[in-house]
């Protein structure tokens, strides 16, 4: 008899554990039922579809705390948690619109949810990752130049513009274009342009090239002034880089392009880019997406030898400022007129975690390390209009002169190197129905910095005489930005009320280089300067 009672108890317990159900409805944000929506218990494969009234039921659910997600074409997927008891559970979904008639929904230029390009009050363009990848270009700035109307990027070979490309939109400077990442303001570069077109002189824009192309899920471009919403730095428009957020999958991409050989035999350089994107789950309710890229873009030049170069001079000294003139590539000329060398590593992370039904924590950012190099104008021995020699001892003419020709008998071509480091981090929390008042909120903090280190080699400072170095640390530039944001949105049917507050701090730092790069040396006393070639005193 005891065995029979025990058997009946086990059967009843089994029925209690595995015969529970979840029921509810799936509707859109306006309360209309969604027929045929998929409702699934996360991680189990159990699921159901909603009927014409939007109702659904999932049976055989294990009691306890579980997560359920609902999805429907053209709407955002929603994931909710519920405690399943002996009596089952009820769970109701309200899905926001994410696409209408195949159109993408945009978040740039509006604070209202579900806004498509057709409904946007301003012209906006959208480019998905497939459009960007088909360019086959490792440089994101170059990719955007080829895709975005009225966006221009000019390659320059002077000063820091060789390392941070000058951009413009609608004919306005680069710092009139606001660059966002996941709708958050991106920091500006450390370079204040003073080379190139007059339009960009004094401009300080963001360096878009620090973001790997493989990390971008979608690009939104607002080609109109948006200063009322974003501030005065959005006069020319807004570019919003939406990062990938998939929680699974691995993608590798390698591109290689070879430049054609010129009639003078120069050419054949290869541009190589290797990139990867990895999506990983962050527990059962989040994601971590990581992207990385390494690119090699060599210096390009198709010019022949400089007409004023001395016989036998092949360019710059790759042995870092010594007299070994044979230690150069055979194709080097005294000056290069083409694209500077630019190599770099770039990485991005994007993470999100559903903390509760209506609250999500998020974090994203980037780290990049780049290197570039290009040549200045040729300093030709004996043909310079500048001071070429100084007396070693102004009180003893028999001591002779010191000339830069003693170090560089065939002349020299200075080389400028730029080492850029870029870092940004954004952390925040967003949710819906704050305090039960129906207010959507987004609290975030961000930090971004761009550091540009300059190094000059194959040169000298004549005022330091024979003690002059040949290579110089000439100084660094740094831009730092810190932001604290609180955004609130209160949807009221067709009316949308948005308000918020922001605290922002910006720092610009200039670090001096080594003293020989900027300080006059002991031979700089004006009345002792003498140009032996011109036969004149400078004093």
Model-derived features: where do they sit?
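N-terminal periplasmic "start-of-domain" segments of outer-membrane beta-barrel proteins
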Residues: 38-55, 105-137, 161, 190-201, ...
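Outer-membrane beta-barrel translocator/receptor signature
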Residues: 200-203, 214-217, 228-239, 244-313, ...
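Extracytoplasmic beta-strand/coil segments of soluble accessory domains associated
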Residues: 124, 144-190
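Short, polar/charged loop or turn motifs at beta-strand boundaries
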Residues: 120-145, 165-172, 203-209, 256-264, ...
């Amino acid at each position: 008899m005891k065995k029979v009672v025990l058997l009946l108890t086990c059967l009843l317990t089994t029925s209690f554990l595995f015969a529970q159900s979840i029921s509810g409805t799936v509707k859109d944000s306006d309360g209309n039922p969604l027929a045929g929506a998929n409702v699934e218990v996360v991680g189990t494969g159990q699921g159901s579809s909603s009927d014409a009234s939007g109702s659904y039921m999932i049976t055989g659910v294990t009691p306890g705390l579980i997560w359920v997600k609902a999805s429907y074409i053209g709407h955002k997927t929603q994931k909710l948690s519920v405690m399943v008891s002996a009596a089952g559970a009820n769970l109701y979904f309200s899905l926001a619109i994410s696409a209408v008639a195949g159109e993408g929904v945009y978040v740039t230029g509006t604070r209202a949810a579900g806004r498509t390009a057709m409904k946007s009050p301003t012209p906006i363009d959208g480019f998905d990752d497939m459009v960007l990848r088909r360019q086959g270009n490792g440089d994101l700035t170059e990719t955007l130049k080829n895709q975005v109307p009225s966006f221009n990027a000019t390659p320059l070979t002077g000063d820091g513009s060789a390392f941070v490309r000058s951009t413009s939109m609608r004919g306005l400077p680069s710092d009139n274009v606001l660059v966002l990442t996941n709708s958050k303001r991106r920091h500006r570069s450390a370079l204040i342009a003073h080379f190139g077109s007059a339009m960009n002189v004094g401009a300080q824009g963001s360096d878009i090239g620090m973001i790997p192309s493989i990390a971008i899920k979608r690009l939104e471009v607002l080609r109109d002034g948006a200063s009322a919403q974003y501030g005065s730095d959005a006069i020319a428009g807004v570019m919003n880089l939406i990062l990938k957020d998939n929680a699974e999958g691995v993608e590798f991409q390698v591109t290689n392009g070879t430049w054609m050989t010129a009639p003078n035999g120069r050419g054949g350089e290869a541009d190589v880019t290797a990139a990867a994107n990895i999506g990983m789950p962050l527990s059962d309710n989040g994601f971590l997406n990581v992207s990385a890229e390494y690119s090699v873009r060599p210096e390009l030049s198709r010019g022949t030898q400089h007409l004023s170069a001395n016989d036998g001079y092949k360019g710059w000294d790759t042995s870092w400022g010594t007299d070994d003139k044979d230690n150069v590539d055979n194709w080097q000329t005294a000056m290069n007129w083409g694209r500077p060398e630019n190599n770099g590593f770039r990485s991005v992370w994007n993470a999100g975690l559903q903390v509760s039904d209506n609250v999500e924590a998020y974090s994203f950012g980037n780290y990049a390390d780049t290197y570039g190099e290009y040549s200045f104008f040729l300093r030709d021995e004996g043909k310079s209009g500048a001071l070429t020699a100084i007396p070693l001892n102004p009180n003893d003419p028999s001591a002779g002169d010191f000339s830069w020709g003693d170090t560089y008998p065939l002349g020299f071509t200075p080389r400028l190197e730029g080492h850029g480091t870029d870092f940004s981090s954004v952390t925040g929390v967003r949710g819906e129905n704050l305090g039960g008042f129906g207010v959507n909120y987004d609290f975030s903090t961000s930090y971004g910095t761009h550091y540009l280190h300059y190094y000059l080699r194959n040169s000298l400072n004549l005022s330091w005489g024979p003690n002059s170095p040949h290579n110089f640390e000439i100084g660094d530039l740094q831009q730092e930005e810190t932001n604290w944001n609180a955004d609130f949105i209160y949807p009221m049917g067709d009316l949308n009320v948005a308000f918020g507050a922001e605290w922002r701090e910006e720092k610009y730092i200039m670090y001096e280089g080594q003293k020989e790069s900027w300080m006059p040396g002991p031979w700089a006393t004006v009345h002792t300067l003498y140009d032996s070639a011109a036969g004149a005193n400078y004093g």
